[in-house]
Amino acid sequence: MGSLLPKLSSGKYPTGSKGVTPRYASGDISSVTGTSGAGRHGYNARMTTFTLQPGRVPLLISLPHDGFFIPADIAERMHPAARRSPDTDWHVARLYEPLAQALGASVLKPQASRYVVDLNRPADGHALYPGQRETGLVSTIGFDGEALYRDGLEPDQDEVRRRIDEYWRPYHQALAQELDRLCNEHGRAVLWEGHSIRSRVPMLFEGRLPDFNLGTASGASCTPALQERLQSCLASQSRFSFAVNGRFKGGYITRHYGAPETGVQAVQLELAQLNYMDEDSFAYDEARASSVQELIGLLLQTCLA
C-alpha cells in the first residue's frame, strides 16, 4: 500500500528523527521510544517525544493529547494556570493501556502537552471546523478562551516550525509506520483515536457534552458496517449518553489516516471527563472509571470482530 505519511504544506512528507522507526519482529512487542534533537526547547540533547507499544492485532490506539510535559523555556513564558496544562486528555492512557494489553493492540502516546503542539491538527494550521472557534496547531489560547502566554511572549513562526519538527513529525512518522506494519501483517488496520474533554466547554459547545462521542468524519473514515456496529454497541446500554458525528466528528488524525478503501479505518472517541475523574482537581476516580473502561473495551472488541 502507499505511504500513509501526511504531506505538509510544502508538499513533502515529514521526515522522522532517528529512533522513530518501530522495532518489531515476530512475537516481539517491546516498547519503542521516539526521540528528537531537542535544541533550545529540550531538557537535554535528545529528548523522548513519544512512546509506542507495538501490538499483535490490527488495532492501533493513538492518544495524541495524553501528554502534559511542557519544556521549561516554554513554560516560563506562560501564565501560571496554563503551566498545569488543564486541557490535557487526563488519564486516557490509564483507561486504554490495560485494555490494549489484554487485546494485544498497539498504543502510541506523546510526552508533551497539546500546548506545545497539537498532534491532532494539520501541520499547515488549517481549521478543522471552519467558522467555529477552536484551538490551533500551536495554540495561544486555552479552552476557556484565556491567553496561554504572557503578553509579547507568544511563539513566532520559527518556533512553530521547530515544534513541528521536534514533536509533530516524529509522532506522525511513528503512527504511519505502525499502520503500515499492521496492514502488511494483517491486511487491514483500525486506528482508534482516544480523547477526553471537560463535560462543559462553552467556547467549543453549548451545554453538557454527551458521555461518549464517536466520530468517523461523518462516515468517511470507516466503513458503514463498522460505524453501525459501534453505534449498536453504544445503543445497547443505557448508563451513558452518546452521539455519533455530533460536535466531535474526528480531528486531523481520524480524517487523514482513515481510508477504508486502503484497508485503514479510523474512529475517534471523545469522552466527557466527569464520567471517570474529578474535572476540577484532575483526580482519577477508579469507581466511575471502571464502567467507562468496560464500555470502551466492548467498542475496541467490536473493531476487531
Predicted regions and their residues:
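Terminal low-complexity, poorly structured segments
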Residues: 1-4, 56
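Low-acidity, Ser/Thr- and Arg-rich intrinsically disordered low-complexity segments
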Residues: 3, 9-13, 17, 23-26, ...
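Alpha-helical transmembrane segments and their juxtamembrane interfaces
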Residues: 17, 22, 28-31, 121, ...
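Conserved N-terminal helical subregion
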Residues: 39
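N-terminal catalytic or cofactor-binding beta/alpha core of small enzyme domains
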Residues: 42-191, 196-305
